[in-house]
Amino acid sequence: MKLKQRVVVLCAVLFLLGLAKVFLLDGGEGSAASRRDLRAFRKMEASLSLAKGARLTHTLQSPWEVAAQWVGPREVYPDETPELAAVLNALATAHVERADVGYKGTQLKALLVLDGGQKVVFKPKRYVRDYVVEGEPYAGYDRHNAEIAAFHLDRILGFRRAPLVVGRFMNLRTEIKPVATDQLLSTFLMHGNNTCFYGKCYYCRETEPACAEGDVMEGSVTLWLPDVWPLQKHRHPWGRTYREGKLARWEYDESYCEAVKKMPPYDAGPRLLDVIDTSIFDYLIGNADRHHYESFQDDGGASMLILLDNAKSFGNPSLDERSILAPLYQCCMVRVSTWNRLNLLKGGVLSSAMRQATAHDPAFPVLTGAHLTALDRRLNGVLATVRQCMETQGSENTLIEDRMNLPHP
């Protein structure tokens, strides 16, 4: 082959390789990384629907023991969980052995112990589904359905960092009051024919109780993480001040991410990329209230950022609070696997997946059509933000290969 022909062939090969890279970066299937991500996506799609009323096919372990064994440093549950539907069904139906106030936090909740000694958090329904929360993006009561939807979004995104959540209808008169502590019982009252309680928390008031319809209250049940995995609380580097007229540094300093990169645990390991993943997750659900976050203790910075307390979400489907994405657009970096997953979810796939994932939840419909539409719209905003970063600094500086999978102990 003549030199000129060789040069032409080489140029053609380089051109095709460049096209393949662009194809990958826009959600294609051209590399080993993208093929792996596509296989993971197809696996998620296949397991998305959860059978109604499922039960474990064996009796060697309780549902709680099964779920406890799933937890590892980088995941709350693995990518293959054939028992997930059975565990969620147990959460939605198991007998309540004890009920107490939920002491920590600012919002109303109850701490329950289910049959077999499993602790769970019950968050009551405060709004009808189509209620729009006005005001600040973190305004309003907790939304129980937001906890449910956020868990399933965690599944869809492939993060697997959120505790298990399911909807449940609880009879306060027959299931809760007979096993309630005196402290919880003292907060029960009647509004007409409806049984209500206001619990104990920073913002809990007798004048603002949560009320059942008659005796039956809709809510969400969140599975308590195993005690062998104690949590450590961290101040979120992109947290808000919650004080009128006072901005956090990230709100006025566009170079703030460079300062964060010099602080542990963000100067090494996966934590900063976890924060960026979380900003995408929170933007999609409209959660502007992640002022702190939890990881596992004594992790040396290797633990995942656990997606706890997602109830200040899905408040206003018309509001896309871009400031939630500050970690993404200020750091201008994101995991390749996250980028590939987001591209596979565009074009209405995300909202369709959410409908499918929540179809058999006891609290279905979990989200209104307006909130499902907002998910797809916000996803487009995330993709546009990443593309802008790639145009500014190149894909090689924006898309980070980080697939840290730590083995279970």
UniProtKB/Swiss-Prot annotation:
Side Cytoplasmic, residues: 1-6
Membrane topology classification: Single-pass type II membrane protein
The EC number(s) this enzyme carries: 2.7.1.-
Chief location bin: Golgi
Single annotated GO MF: phosphotransferase activity, alcohol group as acceptor
TM ranges: 7-25
GO biological process: embryonic cranial skeleton morphogenesis; proteoglycan biosynthetic process
Residues in compartment: Lumenal: 26-409
Bridged cysteine pairs (disulfide): 196-211, 201-204, 257-331, 332-389
Domain of life of the native organism: Eukaryota
Catalytic activity from the UniProt record: 3-O-(beta-D-galactosyl-(1->3)-beta-D-galactosyl-(1->4)-beta-D-xylosyl)-L-seryl-[protein] + ATP = 3-O-(beta-D-galactosyl-(1->3)-beta-D-galactosyl-(1->4)-beta-D-2-O-phosphoxylosyl)-L-seryl-[protein] + ADP + H(+)
Cofactor(s) essential for the protein: Mn(2+)
Binding-site positions, ATP: 107, 123, 222-225, 294, 309
Residues carrying a glycan: 193
Name by which UniProt lists this protein: Glycosaminoglycan xylosylkinase
